[in-house]
């Protein structure tokens, strides 16, 4: 009786691969406006990269500062808020307060030894940290932050072009900006979409 031949069966995934041409380049620019009303008295240079705490430009001689975060500021932030009737109200709390506090911490104005904390609540100690920040910018030390004093973006930005000039009135688009990271672009025919996946 002849011996039987045996073979090991190996199970593997079936993989399809194809080489595609790709382009590495900057993200598409977006328009940026200064909400503070007044006269534009300064603009950052085209090509410059602005990080947290950097100045994007000036309105009426006051700097417009970049903060990093995922929520814009939408109200006046102060340790002494008042209601519509002019009467004092409770301390301000919320996501916008946290964004400001996180930036003050990252810039060194809230530390482990300071009374101010990153806790969603604008206290008197938060106001003192704001005053120290304002002093570093050469501003009056009010302890109050208006939404129009800053621009909040998720990451540092590069100035692509200017949409306005010094001496013009603010309000419209002022700068065209883009994130500083790069993206990969691939032109892909519809029949090849199945070859790629998100991530």
Where are these regions (language model features)?
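Short beta-strand segments of a lipoyl-like beta-sandwich/carrier module
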Residues: 5-11, 16-52, 56-57, 65-89, ...
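A short amphipathic alpha-helical interaction element
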Residues: 81-140
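Short beta-strand-centered interaction patches in the first periplasmic/extracellular domains
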Residues: 122-164
């Amino acid at each position: 009786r002849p011996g039987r031949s045996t073979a090991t069966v190996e199970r593997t995934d079936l993989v399809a691969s194809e080489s595609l041409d790709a382009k590495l380049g900057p993200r598409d620019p977006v328009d940026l406006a200064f909400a503070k009303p007044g006269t534009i008295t300064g603009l950052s240079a085209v090509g410059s990269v602005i990080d947290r705490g950097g100045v994007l430009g000036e309105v009426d001689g006051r700097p417009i500062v970049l903060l990093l975060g995922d929520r814009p500021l939408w109200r006046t932030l102060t340790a002494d808020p008042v209601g519509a009737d002019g009467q004092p109200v409770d301390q301000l709390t919320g996501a916008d307060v946290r964004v400001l506090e996180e930036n003050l911490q990252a810039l060194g104005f809230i530390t482990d030894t300071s009374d101010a904390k990153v806790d969603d609540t604008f206290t008197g100690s938060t106001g003192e940290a704001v005053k120290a920040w304002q002093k570093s910018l050469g501003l009056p030390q009010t302890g109050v932050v208006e939404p129009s004093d800053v621009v909040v973006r998720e990451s540092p930005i590069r100035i692509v072009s200017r949409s306005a000039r010094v001496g013009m009135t603010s309000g419209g688009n002022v700068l065209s900006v883009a994130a500083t990271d790069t993206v990969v672009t691939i032109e892909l025919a519809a029949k090849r979409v199945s070859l790629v996946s998100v991530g």
